[in-house]
Amino acid sequence: MCRQFMYRLGIDLGGTNIVAGVVDENYEIIAKASCKTNVPRPESEICDSMADVALKAIEKAKLTIDDIESIGIGVPGAVNPKTGVIEYSANLFFHNWQVVKMMEERLNTKICVENDANAAALGEYLAGSAKGAKNAIAITLGTGIGGGIIINGKIYSGSNYAGAELGHMVIVKDGKECACGRKGCWEAYASATGLINLTKQEILKENFDFSYMLKSCDGDINKVTGKTAFDAVLAGDANAKAVIDEYIGYLACGLVNIINIFQPDILCIGGGISNQGENLLAPLRTIVEKERYTKHNDKQTVICKASLGTVSYTHLRAHETLRHL
């Protein structure tokens, strides 16, 4: 008997992890698998890893590749969804990578690729926190910062498929070096990587015997994550609070710039750090409200947590793209 619904699969190719998930008709992830990205390494090896985690996720869902209607791959950087080529990705160290062709050879099913934050924005617009909005922006906090912009219900990707690289606006002149080659980019300060670096810097300034942040990482500074400082704040660590306050200040700086330029109805924040919920969002909103250009309260941008996971919105982008082929 034929299945009435063909499942879809989303792959999030990040600078740190590759995550694949099978998604059902309710946009729910029913199974997923992951591995480390381990860049830099050859394109063929990355494709092998993506195919491997995809098949593992399908197996966990007790399905076969024949049950998968389409696969969407979300990638940071300049992505041409029409040609299936990743033209440039600073955090993955790739130029002109024909990822769709290589993945279709491995999995023998329909595949599309999209900038991960564009996919996030579309997913939130179609089925998430931005559903019903006319204009929306999604940012993803990960190895870098991705940005996706919806204007009048359509993704804005610019003339070279590299629009909305919001993480690469400079917020500190001659500041920290970014993977893109510039200095002072927003993502060098406000990405998960930026928070991890701030946390490590604070730990190195502390007395190791009394560092709650270090103790929470079993004394290994290399185990610091984006959660470390937040967890330490909840335990009453004043040094950790200083880290979080500085981090949220950097994050707010970029958000105010974005809101002043675009004035979206909703701005959704995704990525692992967004799981901190109101511990992140409440102080963030306070700063944005104080610094935004528009001061009247009749219609202000709503800042909220993205409600869909990465693999969910990459599958949605695949569905929308392939539906129009």
Task: List each model region and its residues.
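General beta-strand structural signal in soluble alpha/beta enzymes
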Residues: 111-115
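Short beta-strand segments
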Residues: 72-76, 138-144, 148-150
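ATP-binding/phosphotransfer module of carbohydrate and carboxylate kinases, centering on a glycine-rich
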Residues: 2-70, 80-83, 101-109, 126-133, ...
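A short acidic/small-residue loop/turn micro-motif
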Residues: 36-38, 94, 162-165
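Short hydrophobic alpha-helix segments
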Residues: 33-35, 90, 159
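A charged helix-plus-loop insertion that forms the helical arch/lid used to bind
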Residues: 85-95
